[in-house]
Amino acid sequence: MDESSSGIASTGVIASSVPRAVLRTAWYRMAAFMKIARALLACLCAQAGVAVAQHGAASSNMTLLGYEPLAGRSAYQPVIHRQGERWIAYVGHHGGKTQNPLTGRAEDNGTSIIDVTDPRKPRLVAHIPGEPGDGETGGAQMVRVCSGADLPKADKSKVYLLRTFGNLGHEVWDVTAPEKPAKVVTVVDKLKGTHKSWWECDSGIAYLVSGLPDWRTRRMTQVFDLSDPAHPRLIRNFGMPGQQPGSTGPVPTELHGPISTGAKGNRVYFGYGTNKSGVMQIVDRAKLLAGPHEPTAANLAAPEVGRFTLSSMNGAHTTLPVLGTNLPEFARDKGAPRDFVLVVDESLANECLEPRQRVFVVDVTDEKTPVGVATFNVPEKPGDFCSRGGRFGSHSSNENQPPMYAGKVAFFAWFNAGVRAVDISDPFHPREIGYYIPATTDKTDKRCVKTESGERCKVAIQTNNVEVDDRGYVYIVDRANTGMHILELGR
């Protein structure tokens, strides 16, 4: 607040009849009163368990281009796909139910389809309802998209969407006309869990995070051939030894999600664990696909090349490979270029009531013995993120790696600290080069922690996931119902 915006000095009649010194004194008294009133209101609301809005937008070297509210749905995963001359964003949602602004009808949260051809004017064109239920028990969190022109046995004129249906199953939809999505097939159903799957568009191989009823874990991998999406073919079920039916002893950490380098790279990087007891597993893709499919301990162990084990305090949510990195420092050394994987943990507890979750940079040049070489963390100060409300810590990275960013810049979703842009050109020394924290809105939901007298709730941004498109635009979606923001990184 300043004198020109207060409304006092800008009124000509008052200014001409009252001495300026008196006006200035009145302005300062009013400003002090408003500050005290706001603090008192916040205190009273906090004592009553009422949510209080926390902040406006904040940024450095990142600019907001466009915004889509997503009907106030809690959002998990964005994927952006070029379809002819159009660019379409597909956003998976957590469970819940709200009105579809296109139809006026209440729908269970599922998949939002947004035309982002003009990133400054994103436009919701369709919503596919998901499984009924709230939070993790409903919705359709995960989305992947492939063009039929890329899939070996698909209709070349089609575009296909692979998505979860709550925790129950996986589906394929025809989204050739984004405004009129049509279901193609249920790939698998009657599951007890799903999550962040991966789909190779050039081969059609899909690594589906599933929970088969007879397995000992909520999340493992089902490998499917979706080269013809209308006719799915199961290749094998896969997980860590000890997770399979009939095994005994402690159950290894459940799967979170895989990222494959395809046939050319011949590696799949699996992330197990969320915020504790994490494992990054390196798997030989060819052996995974062609090896014996019976889920015995020996058969499950056979494709593994190596693994990186995190502490009991950190998990492995996202495992982003950054391979073939040329570093001037090591140009003449044996082992150049070098391969890395960015292992991103997920924060789960509000207001820092858990070990800090962050990014681990793992050197996998020697795949049998991966070694951590660096970490990236967002400092709690000066943003006071532990007291803002909601989660503070890492969650995920972008997964698309277009030429302008590949091996150079990675983006990390950091819940109430927004999205962070990080220079990874020297993986031994990751360096933040920008950030964007959206403003809360009237749709932003509260986040609560238990107290001795009940609970304390605060409204806070919860940047949940981030993705980039091949044009270089950055997309972030919010877990606390704030919508999708489209950003541009400064050069």
Show where each model-derived region lies.
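Feature marking well-ordered beta-strand scaffolds used for ligand recognition
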Residues: 30, 52-491
